């Protein structure tokens, strides 16, 4: 009998261990609620960590928000990155293009009217390892942009295993600031592996071309009144610019005419401008006021100079650090540190690489895909002067700069001039008025129109409603039939298109629910194994009595189950009624504390947190 119980315990333990070690499925990532929001009924979201490097415990955190409306023939998926390096893409999710804004110190959540998930799936990724909710062994942080490309290719491979319905989407990479380095490197890698069908890139206020961008700091600062144009200021800044030029020439000589991402001597230009802005704005012996280098229309206390901006950033930080959010977004227990906007240690390790600047990758990428550069005109740190100069000097698709005669045209949204725009040979550029380093933070709805124009949504809306692209024709009342889960009437004039849409929707739904059912099916098998073993042991214990009644092994198993039920006072019942798999797939576990903020690397730049660091 002891042997039988040992066998039972061993087999049961083996079955349960196999269940525990089963790879994660979609159901493990399903987001059932958002702290501070009354309901998520209008959202379909998944989030959590994906293991991409088992050797170093490398896990990347993602937050996928599915499109509210399907309006294009093929679904669109936007992958968003923030910069730094080492700054979390939760900035993008909660300050810019995501579905929510944290609006007050009570951590109340409001919808974002300019959210990019209206007509496209949006996938926010904290990368590289150590950024935001992502993590790895601390001695395994990445040291180069080529490694970032490999990391993201591995992530996308694992992501598509979890979400196979996304495998045939049109993919776009988007981001801002130092993502101007990330995105071209990631795009180049994904083109080589063809892991996804990459259609285009969107880079906002990007850091891509050191030479042309460093040289435009002084002209921008003087033209926009960041500092007064005095003889002394011009003299001081010319000295800094001359030092930068010498450093650039030396760097080119060492690297066959190419420049790295950062040149330390050139960073002093920016530091000098901010220092001068402090001197002009501050009373003698005062703490000091300086320009906000992310939005020159604002000021900040020295030495923050922009790091206290945006104004709602403290609410976002508190919301992301609270246990309720950590649990709701399915962050792994292995993530020990609290969320922080930017990890200085990640940035410090990334700066150890000696990668060529991403500008050298742009011509090849422009041969095969469209690229949109957009800039807010109030940003100093990655200002529009620098990016416009980059385009003028860039050679792509057979020519240098814009085709002769092309100039920036007025960009009108809903009858209002929102900036300047031009497109030529797969390259589109938009300068947005009254916008900062984080353009969608200031102009969310205009940026949504910009996105829709670029990825083909505006044309689809125009075909549907008869309005012109860019005229704000996104009227939800016109789109009831395209909304996720809805079905058109049989007499609709576009029934053929609807059939295709319903077919795509069915494929996606089948794939998602297949993943959900796998978890329940595995659990059922484990339960049946345990019940079978219990019945077998009961039969062994009572086999003398069973043989007298000529009862079979199968009969004794069911007899044992029946007696077990009766001993509890009656048959077992399903008190919950019909099981709602979407609501009960993930029961909340114990809250856990992510711990204290990781100490920032001592070598990390104090002045700059979302820009290229040196």
Swiss-Prot record:
Lumenal topological domain residue ranges: 18-518
Gene3D superfamilies: alpha/beta hydrolase (3.40.50.1820)
Keywords linked to the UniProt accession: Apoptosis, Carboxypeptidase, Glycoprotein, Golgi apparatus, Hydrolase, Membrane, Protease, Signal, Transmembrane, Transmembrane helix
Bias-annotated ranges (Basic and acidic residues): 480-491
Entry membrane topology: Single-pass type I membrane protein
Any one of the GO CC terms: membrane
The UniProt record lists the keyword Metal-binding: no
Keyword rRNA-binding: no
Catalytic activity: Preferential release of a C-terminal arginine or lysine residue
Residue ranges, annotated region (Disordered): 465-503
Compositionally biased residues, Acidic residues: 492-501
First-listed, main subcellular location of the protein, grouped into a coarse class: Golgi
One Pfam family named in its UniProt record: Peptidase_S10
Protein name stated in the entry: Pheromone-processing carboxypeptidase KEX1
Gene source species: Yarrowia lipolytica (strain CLIB 122 / E 150) (Yeast)
Higher taxonomy: Eukaryota, Fungi, Dikarya, Ascomycota, Saccharomycotina
Gene: KEX1
């Amino acid at each position: 009998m002891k042997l039988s119980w040992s066998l039972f315990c061993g087999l049961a333990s083996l079955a349960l261990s196999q269940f525990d070690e089963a790879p994660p499925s979609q159901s493990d990532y399903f987001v059932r609620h958002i702290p501070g929001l009354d309901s998520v009924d209008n959202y379909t979201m998944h989030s959590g960590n994906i293991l991409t490097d088992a050797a170093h415990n490398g896990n990347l955190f993602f937050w996928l928000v599915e499109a509210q409306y399907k309006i294009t023939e093929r679904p669109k998926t936007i992958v968003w990155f923030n910069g730094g390096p080492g700054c979390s893409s939760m900035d993008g999710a909660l300050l810019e293009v995501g579905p929510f804004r944290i609006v007050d110190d009570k951590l109340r959540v409001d919808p974002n009217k300019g959210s990019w998930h209206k007509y496209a799936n949006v996938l926010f990724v904290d990368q590289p390892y150590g950024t935001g909710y992502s993590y790895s062994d601390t001695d395994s942080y990445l040291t180069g942009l080529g490694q970032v490309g490999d990391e993201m290719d591995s992530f996308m491979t694992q992501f598509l295993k979890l979400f196979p319905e996304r495998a045939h989407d049109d993919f776009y990479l988007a981001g801002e600031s130092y993502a101007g380095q990330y995105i071209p490197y990631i795009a180049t890698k994904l083109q080589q592996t063809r892991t996804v069908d990459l259609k285009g890139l969107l880079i906002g206020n990007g850091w891509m071309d050191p030479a042309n961008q460093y040289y435009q700091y002084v002209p921008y600062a003087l033209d926009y009144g960041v500092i007064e144009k005095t003889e002394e200021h011009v003299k001081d800044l010319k000295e800094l610019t001359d030092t930068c030029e010498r450093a650039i020439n030396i760097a080119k000589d060492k690297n066959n005419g190419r420049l790295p991402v950062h040149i330390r001597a050139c960073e002093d230009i920016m530091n000098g401008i901010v220092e001068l802005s402090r001197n002009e704005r501050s009373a003698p012996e005062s703490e000091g006021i300086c320009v906000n280098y992310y939005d020159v229309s604002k000021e900040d206390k020295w030495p923050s100079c922009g790091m206290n901006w945006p104004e709602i950033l403290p609410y976002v930080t508190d919301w992301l650090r609270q246990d309720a959010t950590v649990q709701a977004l399915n962050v792994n227990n292995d993530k020990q540190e609290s969320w922080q906007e930017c990890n200085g240690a990640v940035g410090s390790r990334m700066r150890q690489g000696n990668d060529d600047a991403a500008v050298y990758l742009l011509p090849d990428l422009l041969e095969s895909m469209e690229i949109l550069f957009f800039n807010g005109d109030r940003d100093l740190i990655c200002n529009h002067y620098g990016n416009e100069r980059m385009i003028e000097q860039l050679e792509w698709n057979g020519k240098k700069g814009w085709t002769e005669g092309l100039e920036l045209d007025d960009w009108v949204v809903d009858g209002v001039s929102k900036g300047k725009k031009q497109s030529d040979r797969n390259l589109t550029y938009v300068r947005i008025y009254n916008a900062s380093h984080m353009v969608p933070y200031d102009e969310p709805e205009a940026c949504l129109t910009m996105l829709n124009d670029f990825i083909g949504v505006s044309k689809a809306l125009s075909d549907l409603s008869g309005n012109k692209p860019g005229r704000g024709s996104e009227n939800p009342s016109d789109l009831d039939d395209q909304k996720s889960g809805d079905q058109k009437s049989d007499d609709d004039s576009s029934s053929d298109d609807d059939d295709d849409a319903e077919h795509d929707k069915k494929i996606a739904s089948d794939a998602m629910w297949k993943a959900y059912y796998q978890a329940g099916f595995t659990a059922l098998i484990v339960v049946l194994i345990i019940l079978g073993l219990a019945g077998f042991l009961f039969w062994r214990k009572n086999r003398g009595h069973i043989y007298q009644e000529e009862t079979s092994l199968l009969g004794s198993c069911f007899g044992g189950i029946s007696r077990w039920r009766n001993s509890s006072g009656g048959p077992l019942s399903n008190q919950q009624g019909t099981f709602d798999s979407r609501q009960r797939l993930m029961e909340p576990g114990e809250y856990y504390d992510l711990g204290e903020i990781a100490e920032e690397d001592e070598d990390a730049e104090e002045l700059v947190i979302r820009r290229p660091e040196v």
